[in-house]
Amino acid sequence: MLIDGRQMHIQITKGDIGRYVILPGDPARCEKIAQYFDDPKQIAHNREYTLWTGSLDGVPVAVCSTGIGGPSAAIAMEELVECGADTFIRVGPSGGIVDEVCGGDIVIATAAIRQEGTSREYLPIEF
């Protein structure tokens, strides 16, 4: 849904961001991540959604907080796609169930245990 041409929740329009978006949950992490961008600018803040843009090696990038949980992340991603994004990197804490994974480890997941309802709207439960 658009309000004055802007996405309802993230408050941006098509063309405000490029293809690549980093997604932390916590809005406070956005500025910390944006400090690594060339020419960072905060372009929106509404509720749990904070958005910064900049570039890395000349490539436009953005960082957008998603808040907590699947529903708010889905809202952010769907609105970001409407504005031109197509590649996302989720960053932040998560839980684990094996002793071999320690705090501070970087994990690139190939699957997950999903015990919530939002992801079922996007992927089969077997994924």
Give the predicted meaning of each segment:
Residues 1-127:
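Metabolite-binding pocket within alpha/beta catalytic cores that recognizes anionic/polar moieties
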